[in-house]
Amino acid sequence: MKSFIVVLCCLFAITYGQTDLPAIRRNARFQRNLALVALHNQIFGAEGVENGLAKTQEEKVCILNVKEAALEEGNIVLDETVGKIIPEVERLSTSGTEAEIKAFLDKTDYPAYKKSAMNEFKQKIMTWIPAVQGKMAACRK
């Protein structure tokens, strides 16, 4: 059920239109946070299952270490996909000139960008999460 709600929110974030920089800024942050929640659901869900099956403290520590590494790697994936546009939007929002902002808005098709970024994120995560689950399962002897 949680996954269904996250998917609905992702679709809403993708289809909601943006015409100005503040709207793009809000939506880019929202989309990144939404992707972060989806990532955490996958990683913490896998951790919960494996911790339930772990028999020793050593196995649980190993699972925790895999989870921490996965969270770090997941944040890198986020920054390379759905979060890629955020630094430029933040810079323009705080110190961009009118000409820079206009040029950015003219050259950026944000709805198409965010749809492709979210698809890229989902594709990377769906191929990466099974490997994380496998590493966690390998912690149990």
From Swiss-Prot:
From the UniProt annotation, give the residues forming the signal peptide.
1-17
UniProt keyword annotation of Signal present: yes
Tissues showing expression: Expressed by the venom gland (posterior main gland) (at protein level).
* Source organism, top-level taxon: Eukaryota
Disulfide bridges in this chain: C62-C139
Task: Kindly state which keywords UniProt assigns to this record, in alphabetical order.
Answer: Disulfide bond, Secreted, Signal
Compartments annotated for it: namely:
Secreted
Its cellular-component GO annotations read:
extracellular region
Q: Which family does it belong to?
A: Belongs to the insect vpf1 family.
**Name the UniProt record assigns to this protein:** Venom protein family 1 protein 1
Q: What organism, scientifically named, is this protein from?
A: Platymeris rhadamanthus (Red spot assassin bug)
